[in-house]
Design a protein with these regions (language model features):
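Bacterial N-terminal signal peptides that target proteins for export
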Residues: 1-10
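C-terminal motif of bacterial Sec signal peptides marking the signal peptidase cleavage site
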Residues: 16-19
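Bacterial lipoprotein signal-peptidase II cleavage site
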Residues: 21-29
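Sequence signature of WD/YWTD-type beta-propeller architectures
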Residues: 35-377
Length: 377
C-alpha cells in the first residue's frame, strides 16, 4: 500500500493478539541523525527472479490505475480506471505475491515469500531486488518516494532508507512487546510526504523510546536527519503541498505538523485509518458510530472540518482519484474477534463532488496511481 502504504497489512498481522489501550503523549524536537551506511543502494540493485506480474496489454501513459481485486476473482490485478464506466484489467500478479504497490505508472513492487522487496516493470524485462528483510514483527512494511527513486522499509526493529546514497539504518527502535491490540487505536504508518522531502513513521507498537528512538518520527528524506519526534500518537496521514502531517492522540483534536509552524491543533475528529486524496485537498477515514459499526468521513484540508460522511456500515476508505473514494460495506458481528464488524461482501464508490454512492466491482484496493497530483494546497 501507500501511503500508508502498508499500514493495513502490518496491523492485520497483529490483530490476532487482542485489544488494549495506548501510551500517553510526550514530545521531542531535537534533530538526531542516526543513520549508518548499508550495502544495497537503490541506484544499483541486485538482479531479481522472474517477474510475478504479467501484462496482456500496454499500460496507457497517464491513466489512473489501481492494484486490487475484482468481485468474483481473487487474482490481484493492475486495472485501468481512467474511464470508471469502462475499467479494464491490464496485468495480473501471481498468487504468491505479497503487498504489491506502484513504484511509478510503469513499474510495481511486491514482496516474496523469501522476504525480498522486488521491483518489476509493467512492460516486462528483468526484475530487481531492492532490499531483503528478516522475519519478525513489522518487518517488510515499505513505501516509495513520489518519484520512485527512494525506498523506506522496516526490518524488525530497524528503520531503513534506500537511496542513491546507499542503504542506511535511520534508527533502531525498541522491540515491540507482546500485548493486545485495539483495532481502532493501534496503527503503523510509514510514508514519504507528497513532496518527497520527508518520511514519517508513526506507530503504536515500538514504544518506550524518545528522540531518535521515539515511536512517532518525521525525518528528512535527503539525509535521514530527525526533524520531529513525539509519542502517544496514532492514525497519521500526509496531506497538501507543501506537505503537512496530520495525526491524533487517544483524545483531543487532530494535530498538524509542518516544517515551518510545528504542531497546530485542528478539528476534533477521532478518525481511523486516514488516507489523503492525490491533490492533498481531502482526507478520508473510518469513524466509529453509536451502532458499533463504522461510517466513512471526509475532511476538507482547507476548511479544517468534516465536510460529509456516509451512512453507518462503511469502512476501509481509499481514494481512487481526487473525487472518487472506494470503501467496503460492513455489519455488526457479535461472534467475531473482539466484537469487530465484518464485511458484507459489497463495496462502494463515493463521489465527493456529487455526494453520491454506487456499488463497485472492485472487491479490494491495495494501491492507486497517481498518488500525487496538482493542484494541492
Amino acid at each position: 500500500m501507500t501511503a500508508s502504504a502498508m499500514r493495513g497489512a502490518a496491523l492485520a498481522v497483529v490483530l490476532v493478539v487482542g485489544a488494549c489501550g495506548g501510551p500517553s503523549p510526550s514530545t521531542s524536537h531535537t534533530p538526531s541523525p542516526t543513520s549508518s551506511a548499508g550495502t544495497s543502494p537503490l541506484s544499483s540493485p541486485t538482479s531479481g527472479p522472474a517477474s510475478l506480474v504479467h501484462c496482456t496489454t500496454a499500460v496507457p501513459a497517464g491513466d489512473s490505475l489501481v492494484i486490487g481485486t475484482v468481485a468474483g476473482d481473487a487474482t490481484i490485478v493492475v486495472r485501468d480506471i481512467q474511464d470508471p464506466a469502462h475499467a479494464r484489467n491490464l496485468c495480473t500478479f501471481d498468487s504468491s505475491v505479497l503487498a504489491p504497490q506502484f513504484v511509478s505508472g510503469t513499474a510495481v513492487a511486491y514482496e516474496t515469500a523469501e522476504n525480498q522487496i522486488i521491483k518489476a516493470n509493467l512492460s516486462g524485462g528483468p526484475t530487481t531486488i531492492l532490499a531483503t528483510y528478516s522475519s519478525g514483527f513489522d518487518s517488510g512494511q515499505y513505501a516509495f518516494s513520489p518519484d520512485g527513486q527512494s525506498l523506506t522499509y522496516l526490518d524488525s526493529n530497524a528503520w531503513h532508507l534506500v537511496s542513491s546514497a546507499g542503504n542506511r539504518v535511520l534508527t533502531t527502535l525498541p522491540a515491540a512487546p507482546g500485548r493486545g491490540v485495539s483495532p481502532d487505536e493501534d496503527d503503523s504508518f510509514l510514508s514519504f510526504s507528497p513532496d518527497g522531502q520527508y518520511i514519517a513513521y508513526f506507530q503504536t507498537f515500538h514504544t518506550g523510546g524518545t528522540g531518535a528512538t521515539a515511536p512517532d518520527q518525521v525525518r528528512r528524506a535527503s539525509d535521514g536527519a530527525l526533524v520531529y519526534s513525539t509519542s502517544g500518537m496514532t492514525m497519521a496521514v500526509w496531506a497538501s503541498l507543501p506537505s503537512r502531517l496530520y495525526f491524533r492522540a487517544a483524545t483531543g483534536p487532530v494535530l498538524r505538523w509542518d516544517p515551518s509552524a510545528g504542531v497546530t491543533p485542528m478539528d476534533s475528529i477521532h478518525w481511523i485509518r486516514p488516507h489523503q486524496s492525490p491533490d492533498g485537498r481531502w482526507i478520508t477515514y473510518s469513524l466509529r458510530t453509536s451502532t458499533g459499526v463504522h461510517g466513512v468521513g471526509f475532511y476538507g484540508v482547507q476548511a479544517d472540518s468534516q465536510i460529509a460522511s456516509t451512512a453507518a456500515g462503511r469502512s476501509g476508505a481509499r481514494f481512487l482519484s481526487n473525487d472518487l473514494v472506494w470503501y467496503i460495506g460492513e455489519r455488526a458481528c457479535s461472534t467475531c474477534f473482539g466484537g469487530q464488524p465484518t464485511p458484507t461482501g459489497v463495496t462502494y464508490i463515493y463521489s465527493i463532488a456529487g455526494a453520491s454512492e454506487i456499488t463497485s466491482r472492485l472487491s479490494a484496493v491495495h494501491d492507486v496511481w497517481p498518488r500525487v497530483t496538482a493542484p494541492a494546497v
